[in-house]
Structure formats: structure tokens, C-alpha cells
């Protein structure tokens, strides 16, 4: 609920708590007749990924950003026949992301509302506790005083 509320405050048109509503019902309510073009799996929830795969448009793209359990089942038949593109985070693509983000920030993108917690790097455990709690947006670890 915390992150859904944060998304609403940041301008999300619709947020969905899958424990309370079915994605297909929400799609119908907002007038969607096809699936999603882009999906971003950030929760690390296997059932959420499965639901996303089943509700993507042909040729849709899914970014896998959450850490899923090792035994997560992926319906490869749906992925193959719907031409879905699943992409994780790896190597040089991360650097490309940094360059794009830098450009977006320089052009005026305000990321401040997404950053909900800041900790000195020496308090990294508190940062991880905030992330794990589900009651945070982005957590920033400040390395400024690492050698003090």
C-alpha cells in the first residue's frame, strides 16, 4: 500500500493491489482492449510476474527489476507465442541506463519525490531495513563520509 500511494502521489493514473483486485478487471475498467505494451516487474513476486506475462500485448516488453525466487516458473509458451521480450539488468546496459538517466535529470526531471530515505553508508543496514519493510520508495546511501 505504501508504494501504491507513493505512485499515486507521483501521478500514476491507476495503481493495482493484486491482493484486492484482478488485473483483468482493472484493465476492463479503464477501457483496455489489448494487453500492456511495457511491464516493469519490481516486486520480486512470482505470481505478479505470471499475471504480467498473461496480460501483455503481443510483442510486449517486460523489464525484470525485482529479484524473483530461484524456482520461479515462467510460462515460456506464452512468452514465445506472444513474442514477449523479457529483459533483466546486466553489464553494459546498466551504463546506458546511467547515461539516459543523467540526460533526463539534466533536462529537468525531478526525482526527489521518489527518494524517501537517505542514510550514511555506515548505516547501510538501516537502509536495507527500510527497503525490506515495503514502506519506502528509493533509498539512497551517502558515501560522502566513508573515510571519516
Segments predicted by a language model, with ranges:
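Short, charged/polar "capping" segments at the starts of alpha-helices
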Residues: 1-5, 73, 148
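Adenosine-nucleotide cofactor-binding segment
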Residues: 1-51
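Conserved functional loop/turn residues at catalytic and ligand-binding sites
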Residues: 11, 31, 43, 83, ...
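Glycine/Thr-rich phosphate-binding loops of Rossmann-like dinucleotide-binding domains
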Residues: 49-50, 71-73
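C-terminal hydrophobic helical "lid"/dimerization subdomain
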Residues: 50-54, 95-148
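Helix-to-beta-strand junctions that scaffold the AdoMet/dcAdoMet cofactor pocket
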Residues: 56-58
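Rossmann-fold dehydrogenase core element
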Residues: 61, 74-114
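Acidic carboxylate diad motif detector
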Residues: 65-66
Amino acid at each position: 500500500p505504501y508504494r501504491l500511494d507513493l505512485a499515486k502521489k507521483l501521478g500514476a493514473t491507476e495503481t493495482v493491489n493484486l491482493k484486492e483486485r484482478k488485473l483483468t478487471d482493472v484493465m476492463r475498467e479503464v477501457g483496455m482492449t489489448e494487453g500492456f505494451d511495457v511491464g516493469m516487474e519490481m516486486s520480486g513476486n512470482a505470481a505478479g510476474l505470471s499475471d504480467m506475462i498473461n496480460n501483455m500485448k503481443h510483442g510486449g516488453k517486460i523489464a525484470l527489476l525485482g529479484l524473483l525466487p530461484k524456482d520461479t516458473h515462467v510460462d515460456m509458451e506464452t512468452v514465445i507465442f506472444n513474442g514477449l521480450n523479457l529483459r533483466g539488468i546486466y553489464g553494459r546496459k546498466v551504463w546506458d541506463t546511467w547515461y539516459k538517466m543523467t540526460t533526463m535529470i539534466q533536462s529537468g526531471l525531478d526525482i526527489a519525490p521518489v527518494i524517501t530515505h537517505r542514510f550514511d553508508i555506515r548505516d547501510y543496514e538501516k537502509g536495507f531495513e527500510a527497503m525490506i519493510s515495503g514502506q519506502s520508495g528509493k533509498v539512497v546511501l551517502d558515501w560522502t563520509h566513508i573515510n571519516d
